[in-house]
């Protein structure tokens, strides 16, 4: 990645202006029709993280065309400083220690000069010292070793000999690029190479003292995985096995730090097993963690202190420590009837930052002080959306009887009868929509549409529900969506003659499949970065030597090889002759996940077939709609198209 300019620059004047009102009062309810700009812009407030000692808060504030990373003290709310972000794609903000903030940024570019390979999204680390008000990109340079100045995985912070040390995986250059583990010792941010691997799929586990406890290595060509432990500068093979797709995953350490917790997949279910780091023996499976969709780790030790269980309409936070669980239960009581997510916490959990979603507060960030037993609203995520539309949890039976959970967002101020409907399947498809603030669904509801977001089979509701989607692309995963339309029509909520389908990524595929392989359900389709040609998509994965990815997609799609006739059967591009409704394609030029080519070839095929089709190209946009300008472009293009082909009034 070129580094012709720093991704951040310090700008204390704008920081002071923007940070002065991080704590804000609730505004009056919004007007009936909220403009698209209110949803298309990046959030007014995001990435709100509290310092380890609980005395400071960092956050990203966007006002008009100004976007800043800011730091303020809690209590007096004094501004310590800030850094101007501009159009940098900021992905994550976290504290290294009480004086340093680490920002992860990304950009789309080819490999560095002298190397071949596909254009991809490259991630870099930037350090912001809040005492010296200095912004410095972290350097992975280790002479004479050749390295790329990029990060390729999760970071970890440990305290080593009284000094904060950041650990991050990067890339070293041998005959090809290989993953390496680096350390950065603060305050100088001194860089050290501590390990490297010859296999692309490698992960390291750092113990509380900052030593490598173990690493996971996957040999893609052999489908062989290994877990090796590290002691006295010697590697010992602790476990190995073969897996074409579902490999083990290191999660963190046990409560006493003596064991590494590894998640295995057995008979489709997740199983946690402890590996004793002293003698490399395996303990009995742990029941308490098997159902967690995500673990909660102690920041400076990597010890697992709890987890999150995903359910259809909420997430359940579970802490193993009784006092921490009491903290969380008190928080839930402070926000009755609202959905709460833990955004960040002080090291002792006495102060936590929360995302709060609900009818009372809308979508806000809040600070809860355990000792004061008091919650304070820090600010609204979207300033101009004070009263979001209701997002209602629903469920309905699919044709084969499987219960499909989902969410229905209803426009404000209208009768819940015979509404125009937008079906909006999520991407992934191994993902799931959850109850909260969805800027895209809210934007459509503000225009007068009901929005159905089904968690079709193949979604990550639980392991069996996920597996129910294997081999069902364009089949039952597709009819799960239209079954939702029929259900809502039967309930009298929507008008079945006024339904369109809109989606991104896999959702974009589903939108195209809904008007090529189905007929009479939808009046129009909007595909954002959708897959149209599965054969071409599979070829792009194979060309990049992503063998485990290829096997993953083959299983999910339900094909056995590049010559499988089912590829054509479920590729929208092979069925353009069946299209009898207008289609809008939207795609970012910088998309490195679903190539822009997927929309380009679909455009040509539909035009050759004489169908009604448009393509809206988003310049400098990636797969994730990361920029305000192009996110708004997508909303404006899709809403104009929907109003022309499925008027809400």
Predicted segments with their positions:
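N-terminal export leaders
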Residues: 5-11
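Bacterial N-terminal signal peptides
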Residues: 14-24
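Beta-propeller folds
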Residues: 19, 30-352, 359-361
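Signal peptide processing junction and immediate N-terminal pro/mature segment
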Residues: 24-30
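Short coil/loop residues immediately preceding or within conserved phosphate-binding loops
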Residues: 36, 45, 66, 90, ...
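Non-catalytic accessory segments flanking enzyme active sites
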Residues: 202-205, 307, 316-413, 439-442, ...
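Cap/lid segment of the alpha/beta-hydrolase catalytic domain
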Residues: 385-497, 504-505, 539
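Active-site-proximal cap/loop segments of hydrolase catalytic domains
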Residues: 456-649
């Amino acid at each position: 990645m070129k580094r012709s300019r720093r991704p951040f620059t310090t700008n204390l004047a704008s920081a002071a202006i923007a940070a002065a009102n991080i704590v804000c009062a609730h505004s009056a309810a919004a007007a009936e029709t909220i403009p698209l700009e209110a949803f298309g812009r990046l959030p007014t407030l995001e990435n709100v993280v509290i310092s380890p000692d609980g005395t400071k808060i960092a956050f990203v504030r966007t006002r008009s065309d100004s976007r800043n990373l800011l730091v303020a003290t809690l209590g007096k709310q004094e501004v310590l400083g800030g850094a101007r972000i501009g159009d940098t794609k900021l992905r994550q903000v976290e504290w290294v220690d009480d004086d340093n903030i680490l920002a992860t940024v990304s950009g789309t570019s080819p490999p560095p000069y002298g190397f071949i390979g596909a254009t991809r999204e490259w991630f870099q680390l930037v350090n912001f010292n809040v005492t010296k008000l200095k912004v410095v990109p972290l350097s992975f340079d280790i002479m004479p070793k050749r390295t790329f100045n990029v990060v390729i995985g999760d970071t970890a912070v440990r305290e080593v000999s009284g000094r904060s040390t950041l650990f991050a995986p990067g890339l070293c250059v041998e005959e090809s690029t290989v993953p390496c583990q680096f350390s950065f010792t603060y305050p100088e941010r001194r860089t050290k190479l501590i390990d490297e691997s010859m296999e692309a799929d490698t992960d390291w586990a750092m113990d509380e003292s900052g030593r490598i406890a173990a690493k996971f290595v996957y040999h893609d060509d052999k489908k062989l995985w290994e877990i090796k432990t590290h002691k006295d500068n010697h590697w010992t093979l602790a476990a190995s096995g073969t897996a074409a797709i579902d490999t083990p995953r290191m999660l963190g350490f046990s409560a006493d730090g003596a064991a590494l917790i590894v998640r295995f997949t057995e008979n489709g279910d997740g199983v946690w097993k402890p590996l004793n780091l002293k003698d490399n023996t395996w303990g009995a499976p742990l029941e308490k963690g098997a159902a967690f969709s995500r673990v909660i780790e102690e920041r400076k030790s990597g010890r697992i202190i709890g987890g999150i269980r995903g359910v259809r309409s909420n997430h359940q936070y579970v802490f193993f420590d009784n006092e921490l669980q009491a903290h969380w239960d008190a928080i839930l009581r402070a926000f009755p009837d609202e959905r709460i997510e833990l955004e960040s916490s002080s090291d002792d959990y006495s102060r936590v930052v929360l995302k709060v979603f609900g009818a009372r507060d809308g979508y806000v960030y809040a600070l809860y002080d355990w000792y004061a037993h008091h919650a304070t609203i820090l600010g609204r995520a979207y300033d101009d959306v004070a009263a979001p539309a209701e997002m209602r949890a629903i469920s309905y039976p699919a044709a084969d009887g499987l219960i499909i959970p989902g969410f229905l967002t209803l426009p404000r101020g209208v009768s819940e009868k015979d509404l125009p409907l937008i079906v909006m399947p999520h991407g992934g498809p191994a993902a799931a929509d959850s109850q909260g603030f969805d800027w895209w669904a809210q934007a459509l509801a503000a225009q007068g549409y009901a929005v159905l977001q089904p968690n079709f089979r193949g979604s990550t509701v639980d392991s069996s529900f996920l597996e129910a989607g294997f081999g069902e692309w364009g089949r039952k995963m597709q009819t799960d969506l239209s079954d939702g339309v029929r259900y809502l029509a039967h309930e009298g909520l929507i008008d079945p003659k006024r339904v369109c389908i809109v989606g991104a990524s896999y959702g974009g595929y589903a939108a195209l499949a809904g008007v090529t392989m189905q007929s009479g359900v939808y009046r129009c389709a909007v595909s954002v970065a959708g897959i149209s040609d599965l054969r071409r998509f599979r070829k792009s994965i194979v060309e990049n030597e992503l063998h485990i990815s290829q096997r993953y997609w083959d299983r999910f799609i339900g094909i056995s090889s590049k010559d499988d006739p089912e590829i054509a059967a479920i590729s929208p591009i092979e069925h353009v002759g069946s299209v009898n409704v207008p289609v809008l394609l939207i795609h970012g030029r910088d998309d490195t996940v679903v190539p822009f080519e997927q929309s380009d070839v679909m455009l040509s095929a539909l035009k050759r077939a004489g169908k009604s089709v448009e393509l809206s190209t988003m310049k400098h946009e990636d797969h994730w709609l990361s920029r305000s300008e192009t996110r708004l472009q997508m909303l404006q293009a899709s809403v104009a198209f929907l109003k022309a082909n499925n008027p809400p009034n």
